[in-house]
Amino acid sequence: MKKLLILLACLGISTTAFAYSNADLEKVQAGSNCVNGDLSGADLSALDLSGRNFEGTNFNQARLVSTNFNNTSLNDAKFDHALMNNAKFRGADATNVSFKYAVGAGADFTNADLAASNFYRAQLRGAKFLNANLKHIEAQEASLDSIIADYANFSNANLPYAWMYKAQLKNASFNYANLYSAKLQHADLSDADMTSAKMGKTNLRSSILANAKFNAAVLDNADLRNADLTYTEFGTATKMNTKFE
């Protein structure tokens, strides 16, 4: 038993039993707000929860497949290990939210305010972050392949070792973001602002960097082979051992 608990801990899986509050669940099912509630482990799949207030509520390990959180207040809520495939968070106020280890393929965060939220090791392949506020997010080792995040603001975001293969990031801002060793092969970063970004060992092979701005960025040991560098501006970026061909 001890060995099993150690294995679960190493995998980032909590051994705590998650039991939602029946009173909170009934409140939600009745169409009410649920501030600082406990919905951990609850199945809320496909429910329309749009426009409600869930600030500080615990959704850890909840099942939220295709759940509608559009225009909700979710500040300080927790979604650790939640299953959120195709969930909708369009226009949500979701600052300082914890999405650690959450699985949300195809989730829609268009126009959401996600500032200072934590996506550590979250799996969000194909999620939409169009025009989303992602300032100061923590997304180390997050799986963000094929996300659609045109015009999103990743300023000061922490994204080391993140997977962003084939991500659509046109006109996105990464000012002062940490993208150390991030995987951005075949990503579209045309017109993106990478000013002062930390991109040591970042993989940008075959990416589209047309009109992108890298002034004062750190590109040491980055891989830009076969990238589209049409009108790309490097300014004072450092490029020690950067691979261009």
Question: Which ranges hold each PLM region?
Answer:
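Tandem repeat scaffolds
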Residues: 20-245
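Positively charged n-region of N-terminal signal peptides that target proteins for export
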Residues: 1-4
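Sec-dependent N-terminal signal peptides
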Residues: 6-8
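N-terminal signal peptide c-region/cleavage motif recognized by signal peptidases
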Residues: 14-16
